[in-house]
């Protein structure tokens, strides 16, 4: 019996000694929450989770003042890196118009589609509901989603289409920096339209640092390939050359404008009309000018519509026709041409 007690005492002593030894091990200090600055560095290096965490911090006062618009920017950064929680959060911002983000059902659904592809049950449910309840928005969002998926695997046409949705007038909220990224993908695939649009952004410093050398290289390639937007650029450049550059080269300008006009560019058609009217770089011809203005007007060019309407009203190079004048001036006014609005008041 004494032996059993002895064993018990030994075992308790041993255990006590073990616990006592463990008690002297310094506990691990809890990790400090990452600062906004530390997360910003990681996010800038491409860490999607850090960008998302930083967005969460900016939604609150954690680590500093709340800044919802900055939060949205970091969620967008993480969302484009395929971080599903950020895609869902950003979708909510667009669905509800939160944090200074313009309400946009199409963009909200686009991000839900990406999150659904990543396995989000919530997003899958919302996409399914949109399919049955809002087919028009679903169709547009799915078209953008498809272009984005193609762009991600290197499709030039997909990249060009997705970039267009990010530019002014696209279905997504304007994001010129992201548009430049995808235009570059398409330009590398030697797509002239992408080269022209990217070249113009470099020329104007839109969404990217201004770089005339890159602009000229891209626009030259696109123009030689027959891209009307690039041909229009070279025509304008020749038309507006400064004295230091040798002054305007009207013959060169007319050549480029004609090339672009023949491909249906309404601005080039209008400018061709201007040059015919003034005899710059070509013969002076009112009839040819009106033909060029009429082509541009038919294509929806507001200034050309005004010129055609004014010509009918005053009988300039064409038989006077008040009905035709009113028709074209009304179109021009609807397209925002103030001179057309004023002349319509005079006709009335």
Regions found by a protein language model. Give the residues of each.
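Structural signature of tandem alpha-helical TPR/SEL1-like repeats
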Residues: 28-37, 65-74, 101-111, 135-146, ...
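N-terminal Sec-pathway targeting helices
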Residues: 1-10
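N-terminal leader/linker segments that initiate helical-solenoid repeat arrays
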Residues: 9, 13-56, 128, 132, ...
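Ankyrin-repeat and related helical/solenoid repeat scaffolds used for protein-protein interactions
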Residues: 84-109, 270-278, 283-339
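Canonical positions in the second alpha-helix
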Residues: 40-42, 77-78, 114-115, 147-150, ...
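Hydrophobic face of amphipathic alpha-helices that form TPR/SEL1-like repeat modules
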Residues: 53-60, 89-96, 126-133, 161-168, ...
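Short helix-capping/linker turns of helical repeat alpha-solenoids
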Residues: 45-47, 60-62, 80-83, 97-98, ...
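Leucine-rich solenoid repeat scaffolds
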Residues: 112, 116, 123-128, 322-347
């Amino acid at each position: 019996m004494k032996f059993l007690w002895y064993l018990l005492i030994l075992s308790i002593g041993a255990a006590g000694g073990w616990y006592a030894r463990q008690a002297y091990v310094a506990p691990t200090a809890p990790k400090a929450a990452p600062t906004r600055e530390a997360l910003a560095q990681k996010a800038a290096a491409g860490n999607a989770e850090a960008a998302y965490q930083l967005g969460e911090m900016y939604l609150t006062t954690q680590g500093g003042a709340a800044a919802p618009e900055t939060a949205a920017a970091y969620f967008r950064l993480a969302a484009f890196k395929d971080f599903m929680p950020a895609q869902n959060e950003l979708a909510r911002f667009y669905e509800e118009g939160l944090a200074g983000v313009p309400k946009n059902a199409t963009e909200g659904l686009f991000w839900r589609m990406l999150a659904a592809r990543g396995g989000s049950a919530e997003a899958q449910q919302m996409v399914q509901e949109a399919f049955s309840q809002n087919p028009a928005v679903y169709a547009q969002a799915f078209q953008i989603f498809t272009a984005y998926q193609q762009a991600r695997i290197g499709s030039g046409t997909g990249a060009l289409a997705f970039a267009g949705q990010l530019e002014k007038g696209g279905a997504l909220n304007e994001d010129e920096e992201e548009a430049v990224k995808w235009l570059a993908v398409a330009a590398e695939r030697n797509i002239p339209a992408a080269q022209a649009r990217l070249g113009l952004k470099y020329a104007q410093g839109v969404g990217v640092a201004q770089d005339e050398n890159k602009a000229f290289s891209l626009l030259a390639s696109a123009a030689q390939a027959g891209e009307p937007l690039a041909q229009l650029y070279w025509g304008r450049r020749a038309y507006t050359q400064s004295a230091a550059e040798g002054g305007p080269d009207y013959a060169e300008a007319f050549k480029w404008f004609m090339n672009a006009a023949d491909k249906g560019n309404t601005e080039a058609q209008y400018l061709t009309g201007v040059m015919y009217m003034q005899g710059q770089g070509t013969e002076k011809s009112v009839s040819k000018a009106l033909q060029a203005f009429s082509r541009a007007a038919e294509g929806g060019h507001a200034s050309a519509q005004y010129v055609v309407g004014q010509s009918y009203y005053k009988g300039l190079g064409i038989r006077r026709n008040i009905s035709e004048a009113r028709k074209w001036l009304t179109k021009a006014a609807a397209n925002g041409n103030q001179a057309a609005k004023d002349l319509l008041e005079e006709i009335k």
